[in-house]
Design a protein with these regions (language model features):
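N-terminal, intrinsically disordered, polar/charged segments of Gram-positive cell-envelope systems
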Residues: 47-95
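Domain-level detector of nuclease and nuclease-like folds
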Residues: 87-260
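Hydrophobic membrane-insertion alpha-helices, especially the h-region
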Residues: 31-45
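Positively charged n-region of N-terminal signal peptides that target proteins for export
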Residues: 25-29
């Protein structure tokens, strides 16, 4: 006959085993809940989740396109061409600031006080290893140079010499790069070289919702020493390519069929 002490020991041992198993089950349950919630947020995040992420990453989340003005074809004039810079930044102290990539890996605002000292003195190196969000390597015969997409520097290399920096690169069309942005970058570059003055320069990629490809970029510029008389503009450059239909959510594209 089992003694009372042996019986007590057996009951205690069984209780410990049950408690241990129950503890493991509770941990497993908590882990499953975490996995389910995380998966839900990752695959099905809605507008409320996006708004929350905007609050968490206010300095790096690129805003939607909300302002429109006079349409000039490759670009749109914003706010009567008046940029919106803080007075405290209107100094002759050069700087560069780049936003962190947001929760989708997209580049955000790039901001600089550009002077001759920031400009490059060497040739630009290859940036082919960098693939910004929405990137696809695809060719069309109707696109000059064939390739639809370029790696666009938000602040052009000729202005600050910033090259292999993923915080300063987005996926843009050939048309946006060479027709849309280049003329404004060259205007600023030529002005600085001729006057040795400073120019405040800010480029803001505009994404609609959770699109991986920017709809375009807002570019603002203001020359410091002459209070904007030399350079002053506020424009939106469209990320488009004539004859090509683009899915800005993914970066996919297709040739527009000729209806004629």
């Amino acid at each position: 006959i089992m003694s009372i002490s042996s019986l007590t020991h057996l009951v205690t041992h069984d209780k410990i085993n049950i408690d241990s198993r129950w503890s493991k089950l509770k941990k497993l349950k908590r882990l499953l809940i975490i996995i389910i919630v995380t998966a839900f947020l990752y695959f099905y995040y809605n507008e409320e989740t996006t708004n929350l992420l905007k609050k968490i990453f206010p300095d790096s989340y690129s805003t939607d396109v909300t302002e429109v003005g006079e349409d000039k074809g490759s670009y749109i004039i914003i706010n009567n061409n008046e940029p919106d810079f803080n007075d405290e930044d209107k100094t002759t102290d050069s700087f560069e600031k780049y936003s962190k990539l947001d929760f989708l890996g997209r580049a955000g605002v790039a901001y600089a006080n550009i002077s001759k000292e920031l400009m490059p003195t060497t040739e630009r190196e290859s940036i082919g290893m960098i693939k910004p969000t929405g990137w696809h390597t695809i060719k069309y015969d109707i696109v000059p140079g064939k390739y639809l997409y370029n790696r666009c520097h938000l602040i052009g290399y000729q202005l600050t010499g910033e090259n292999r920096n993923e915080l300063n690169l987005i996926t843009c069309t050939r048309q946006m790069n060479t027709v849309g942005m280049l003329q404004w970058e060259s205007m600023v570059s030529n002005y600085i070289k001729e006057t040795n003055n400073n120019v405040l320069y800010r480029v803001t990629p505009k994404y609609e919702g959770n699109n991986l490809l920017a709809s375009g970029v807002q570019i603002e510029a203001y020359s410091i020493q002459d209070n904007g008389k030399g350079v002053k503009f506020n424009i939106f450059v469209k990320n488009i390519q004539d004859g090509i239909e683009i899915d800005y959510k993914t970066g996919d594209s297709k040739l527009i069929e000729n209806n004629n």
